[in-house]
Every structure is written in C-alpha cells, then in structure tokens.
Curated annotation (Swiss-Prot):
GO terms for cellular component: aminoacyl-tRNA synthetase multienzyme complex; cytoplasm. This is Proline--tRNA ligase. Keywords: Aminoacyl-tRNA synthetase, ATP-binding, Cytoplasm, Ligase, Nucleotide-binding, Protein biosynthesis. Its EC number is 6.1.1.15. It is an enzyme of class 6 (ligase). Catalyzes the attachment of proline to tRNA(Pro) in a two-step reaction: proline is first activated by ATP to form Pro-AMP and then transferred to the acceptor end of tRNA(Pro). GO terms for biological process: prolyl-tRNA aminoacylation.
Length: 461
C-alpha cells in the first residue's frame, strides 16, 4: 500500500482525525487522536515552563492596520489571510484578519508591558488555532487551512547576546521534544530566500516521511530588532538610554502529530510512543468456560496495580481475542497483557510489545517492574529504529566541480535514484536561488552532518 493511502486510512481506522467537515483543509480531532495531541503538547508545555516561559492567550482577530504595520512580514503570506468583513449585516470600518500567526498581535501588547531593562527577558507562548488560505493540495494534519494546534513562543531580550542564547535554548527544547516523541530530525539554517519574513535568520527542523519526502516540523527564528523597530518596542537601558528589544519566535504545529503517526506506523497500524499513547497498556482476559471469574478478578487486580503509573484499559468486550489484538494493534497501544487460567495457575502474565511484536512471559507479582523495563527499551528502540530509517534516506554526493549546471544535473540524478535528503558539500558560489531553480527540488539550507557543513536538498510537502 502506498504511504499516502495508508496515512489517510489509518487516521480513520485508528480514530485520529475526521476530514469530512465541509470546508477544505479543516477537520476534526477524534477523541483518541485528541488525546495523542494533548499528551504531546503537555510534553512541550513542560519543557517551556521548565525554562521560564509563561503561557498566555491572545485574541484571534487582528485589525487590518495592525497586521499591515509589518510590511515585509505580511508579504510572506498576504494572499493566505482570511478576512472578517462584516459584523452581522453591517460592514466593518476596519477589516479583521483571522490570526495567520501572532507576531503583530503579541508585539503590540509587549510594547505596553516592556518599559525598562528589568522587564526583560520576556518569554511568552500560546497554543492556538491559526488560519491560512492554502491553495495547494491540503492534507490532514500536514497542510491545513485551520491549523488547530500551533504552539508559538515569542521572546524579547535586552541584548543581542541574550537573544542568541535564546535561539540555542529554543533549539535544545525542540530537540528534547522530538526525542520524547521519538522523531529524528535534520536541523538546517534556512537560506536567505526562504527564511521567515522579517527574521535575521531561520533554523528549521525537518524529518523524512516513508515516501521519502521531507517535512518541516518546527522552526526557530532570530528576529533581531526588526519587529521591535516597527512596533517601537523600546526599553530603558541600565545607563538610562533607549534601545530596541531583541526578539525571537519559534513554533511547532499539528505536523508533529502527523510525524509520529507516519514515521512509526507499520502495515498493522499505528505504533505510538509511550509518553503520548492515550492507552499505554491494554489488558485482555482469556476466558474459558467455568474459569471466567478467576480471570476477571486477576485482571482487575493487575489493572489496579498498573494504573498507579500508567494509562490502562481492560478490554472486556464479548468478542474473540484475535479481534481484540487486531483492534489495539491498529490503535498502536504500546503494550498488550494477556491473562488466562493457566497463567494464573503459574503466577505468570504474557506481555506483547507493539513496536516489534515480541512476546514475553513474566512473573505476575513483578508486573510493574517488568513493564517499566519493557517501556524503557521500547522508547529507546523506537527512536533508534526511526533514526536508522532517516539515515537510510540521506545521500551525500561529492561536489568536486563548482559548475552550477553540472552539479544541478548530478543532484537531479541523485534525487531520481534515491528518496530523502541529498547533501552537497557547501560552496558559496552555488548556494543561491538559481541553483534551486535548476534542481526541481527545495534547498532546505545549511546542515551540519557528521561534523561537516552541507547544502541539504529534498522534495518537500
């Protein structure tokens, strides 16, 4: 089955997302999918909270004159903005944009709050819906007109040095987040022609899907003083002078959820990382006539023990065990525990891992420790397996000549022969938009790989 078909099918079968809402590019998180989203963003929230970020919530509506204040910024997506033009039947004097992103909203308010150097640093974030009128082919959780889960952080600092340190911290936070959901990434400094509008530079996190295409799943932007000058975000320095704040912003969206679905899944269904699984353990009683009660009591006992640490579900439906196994494999539950009369007699339990199908018989009295050990290995194994997959999608080609046309043909041939990311040793003379136009692919930017600097190239979503 082609990846595209598998992806669309698993979103429905596993109860993740329903795209039948009557607006293109808008869908509904189903309860199971919403829990994956919730647990994922809880990890991200904790990482931000632990580094002194404060969560907040800003309005969705942005006045046209405020959005237009940052000219270079709005040029990056002015054709994608949704506009509110009426209140009821009455035309509005000033059109209101549905939030495409929140720089203009947040920086207008930061100006009200930041007066002196002691007000800095200010590190805010929110998780909100954003809207873009995507004209390309929309795909659930990948390319949406309503992005339902956009975590955007915005910071302001008194010095350029503090601003640069914040960029490093943001990259570390995102690195830890993607490790937690077992997603390997390639980090690139985006080229000048593809950086965030209004930024000094952009760092981006990309991963590779099973079809070999690359997807951007996180960005970190150094804004310098560009937005601060536009919004007159000034503060009084320790020596009594005035200066503009130095700013950063960084975002992660529903694409993080799409990535963990796509990268870990297999022909049976989802394979969910431990920490974001709505159900971490499913208990399945194996019932035999005349011994139902003893099995049910044991299942209840184990469930009570396991629920002290994990999210547990007992599947007591009156259907065959094989059907239950299949259902929970589709949903990607990390661990299945089976208990039958013989297991009870022997003081055992059978545990089955979703990531590799390994079946183990363990001592029932020690079930909590056995599960903990299994989960530690599961998490490490899932990240290692995903990393090995990503490495197979990386091709390094030598650049012994500086001829633009010859190199572009070499890159195009490499892309036709292998999916994923092509790495070309960096040469300043070929790192430009003209080169990108010749290769029928995207230049992701400058990437450090095995200690060397490369131009990274890929076909993208």
């Amino acid at each position: 089955m082609e990846f595209s078909e598998w992806y669309s099918e698993i979103l429905e079968k596993a109860g993740i997302y329903d795209l039948r809402y009557p607006i293109k590019g808008c869908g509904v998180y189903l309860p199971y999918g919403f829990k994956i989203r919730r647990y994922s963003f809880e990890i991200l929230r904790k990482l931000l909270d632990d580094t002194n970020h404060d969560e907040t919530l800003f309005p969705m509506l942005i006045p046209e004159n405020l959005l237009a204040k940052e000219g270079e910024h709005i040029k990056g997506f002015e054709d994608e903005v949704y506009w509110v033009t009426h209140g009821g039947k009455s035309p509005l004097e000033i059109k209101l944009a549905l939030r495409p992103t929140s720089e203009t909203t947040m920086y207008y308010m930061m100006k009200q709050w930041i007066k002196v150097h002691t007000d800095l640093p200010m590190k805010l974030y929110q998780v909100v819906n954003t809207f873009r009128y995507e004209t390309k082919h929309t795909r659930p959780l990948i390319r949406l007109r309503e992005i339902m889960s956009f975590k955007e952080a915005h910071t302001a600092h008194s010095t350029q040095d503090d601003c640069n340190k914040q960029i490093k911290e943001a990259i570390e936070i995102y690195g830890k987040f993607f490790d937690e959901i077992c997603i390997p990434v390639i980090i690139s400094k985006r080229p000048e022609w593809d950086k965030f509008p209004g930024a000094d530079y952009t760092m981006a996190f990309d991963t590779i899907f099973p079809d070999g295409k690359t997807m951007q799943i996180g960005t970190v932007h150094n804004l310098g003083q560009n937005f601060a000058k536009t919004f007159e975000l000034e503060f009084e320095t320790p020596d009594g002078n005035k200066d503009y704040a130095y700013q950063t912003c960084y975002g992660i969206s529903d694409r993080a959820i799409a990535s963990l679905i796509a990268i870990h899944g297999d022909e049976k269904g989802l394979v969910i990382p431990i920490d974001v699984a709505p159900i971490q353990i499913v208990l399945i009683p194996l019932l035999f006539k005349g011994k139902e009660e003893i099995v049910i009591e044991k299942i209840k006992e184990l469930s009570k023990i396991l629920k002290t640490k994990y999210r547990v579900h007992v599947d007591d439906r009156d259907i065959r065990p094989g059907r239950k196994y299949n259902d929970w494999e589709i949903k990607g539950v990390p661990l299945r525990i089976e208990i039958g009369p013989r297991d009870i007699e022997e003081g055992k339990a059978v545990i089955v891992r979703r990531d590799n199908g390994q079946k183990m018989t363990v001592e029932a009295f020690n079930i909590l420790n056995e599960v903990e050990k299994t989960f530690e290995d599961y998490k490490a194994s899932l990240l290692q397996k995903a990393t090995e997959k990503l490495e197979k999608y990386i091709t390094v080609i030598e650049n012994d000549k500086k001829d633009l046309l010859l190199l572009s043909e070499k890159v195009k041939f490499a892309l036709s022969e292998s999916k994923g990311i092509i790495l070309v040793p960096y040469i300043e003379s070929i790192y430009n938009e003209e080169f990108e136009g010749l290769i029928d692919a995207s230049v992701l930017g400058l990437t450090t790989y095995n200690g060397k600097e490369y131009i990274s190239i890929a076909r993208t979503y």
